[in-house]
């Protein structure tokens, strides 16, 4: 089932993957890809893909105003807890606030009530039709302090130096040019102004019901916002599936303490943390970590982080970015989603200590798992396609890329409850190919007819046809 939403499409996965795709769009895609193939040009431009990869994420397409009703779904109150989010912002009457990428005004209308009397709300969107939908809802609710702002993809067009709070709810990942947008947001903030940023979680799987390019990791967000001249004041994790960041302009007038953030390996080198790693199961590694300094700190870790086992146990590799807030002096538990390396070895258990190493320890697996974390692919000039990012797909990709495993040897171990082994292997091959590995040189390619025969996912079938030409 496909439900069009504000920033994403929610997918209900089962074994019938052809029914979990947009049938009509893929039929058109098939015709386009076939024509492109006949013209001898069936690869996307390398430069465009490189530019996107260098950003460490793939910006998503923005949501059309045609899906505006979904923004007002009743379930959103439970899923996103908007009133609690606004409570954390501590808005006051007279505040000047803005909702960037406001859509139907879901947050803007709530803020309007909190900043009255005397306060104003700038409701910014890049679609005039969306702003008209917002205006109608504002009229229905009798609100008089909401002003529509038509922005552009590179400038929110907000008044300079006036805004006390800007909220960006599940929209930042859609900004195709975030640098100028963040510069515009920075200009709009009052001297003590702040930004509340909501993004679905990439790291722990709680946001996996969302398309891959509609989720972000703490590591990705902080990297981009710091580069744009912001500093992290707080990170709140009370929502079921979303991160809530509070940012402010770096070096500004606010005197509140900031939340210092560090890459795990930098923190270890600086003596800021102590950490231990232990086996858990075939999908996770358990870390125990504590800070050595008195102030709370944020630690992030990269996809591809390597965990070396001893006693002939299976090494593990992080399959997503990770994050943990160290706000206590005692040891804290930290679970990292991981995948195993050597198929023939036993998994490490909770009694097996692991040695933490950088992703460069196994660059092939780092490259493959990075592509899995990106979670998208294209065929020719097709729209973005979204393979399932389940453990069995990730595991198959690692075994194919690293150990050149055969389908026959892997089949029983990659038979997940939602993804048949043939689909897991086919999608794994897509990720392996996107990591720069020639899949036709892998032993599993000798079994390609067994794998691809009968698959009903048209994107996979087109991809396969292009590989066999």
Predicted features and spans:
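Class I SAM-dependent methyltransferase SAM/SAH-binding core
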Residues: 98, 104-155
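A short acidic, Gly/Pro-enriched loop at the edge of an enzyme's catalytic core
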Residues: 156-165
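Conserved class I S-adenosyl-L-methionine
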Residues: 194-218
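Asparagine-centered strand-capping/turn motif at beta-strand->loop junctions
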Residues: 289-295, 299
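Intrinsically disordered, low-complexity Pro/Gly/Ser/Thr-rich segments with frequent PxxP/GP/PP motifs
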Residues: 308-353
């Amino acid at each position: 089932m496909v439900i069009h939403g504000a920033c994403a499409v929610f997918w209900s996965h089962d074994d019938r993957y052809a029914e979990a795709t947009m049938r009509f769009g893929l039929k058109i895609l098939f015709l386009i890809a076939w024509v492109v193939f006949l013209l001898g040009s069936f690869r996307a431009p390398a430069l465009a893909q490189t530019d996107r990869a260098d950003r460490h994420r793939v910006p998503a397409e923005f949501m059309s105003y045609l899906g505006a009703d979904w923004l007002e779904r009743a379930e959103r109150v439970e899923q996103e807890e908007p009133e609690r989010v606004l409570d954390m912002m501590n808005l006051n009457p007279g505040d000047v606030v803005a909702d960037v990428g406001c859509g139907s005004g879901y947050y803007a209308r709530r803020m309007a009530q909190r900043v009255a009397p005397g306060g104003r709300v700038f409701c910014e969107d890049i679609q005039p039709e969306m702003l008209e939908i917002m205006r109608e809802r504002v009229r229905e609710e009798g609100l008089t302090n909401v002003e529509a702002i038509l922005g552009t993809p590179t400038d929110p067009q907000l008044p300079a130096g006036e805004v006390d709070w800007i909220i960006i709810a599940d929209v930042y990942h859609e900004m195709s040019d975030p640098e100028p947008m963040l510069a515009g947001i920075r200009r709009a903030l009052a001297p003590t102004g702040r930004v509340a940023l909501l993004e679905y979680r990439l790291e722990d799987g709680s946001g996996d019901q969302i398309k891959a390019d509609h989720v972000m990791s703490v590591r990705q967000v902080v990297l981009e916002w710091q580069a744009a001249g912001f500093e992290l004041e707080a990170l709140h994790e009370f929502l079921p599936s979303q991160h809530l960041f509070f940012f402010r302009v770096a070096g500004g007038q606010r005197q509140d303490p900031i939340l210092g953030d560090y890459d795990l390996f930098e923190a270890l080198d600086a003596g800021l943390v102590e950490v231990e790693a232990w086996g858990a199961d075939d999908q996770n590694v358990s870390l125990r970590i504590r800070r050595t300094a008195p102030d709370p700190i944020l630690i992030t870790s990269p996809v591809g982080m390597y965990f070396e086992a001893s006693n002939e146990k299976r090494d593990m590799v992080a399959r997503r970015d990770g994050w943990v807030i160290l706000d206590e002096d005692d040891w804290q538990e930290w679970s990292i989603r991981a995948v195993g390396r050597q198929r023939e070895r036993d998994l490490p258990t909770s009694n097996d200590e692991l040695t933490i190493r950088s992703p460069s320890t196994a660059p092939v697996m780092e490259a493959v798992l990075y592509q899995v974390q990106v979670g998208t692919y294209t065929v020719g000039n097709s729209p973005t396609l979204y393979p399932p990012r389940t453990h069995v797909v990730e595991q198959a990709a690692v075994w194919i890329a690293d150990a050149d495993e055969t389908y026959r040897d892997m089949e029983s171990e990659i038979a997940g409850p939602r993804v048949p082994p043939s689909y897991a292997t086919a999608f794994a091959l897509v990720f392996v190919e996107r990591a720069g590995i020639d899949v036709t040189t892998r032993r599993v390619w000798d079994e390609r007819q067994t794998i691809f025969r009968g698959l009903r996912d048209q994107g996979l079938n087109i991809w396969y046809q292009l590989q066999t030409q």
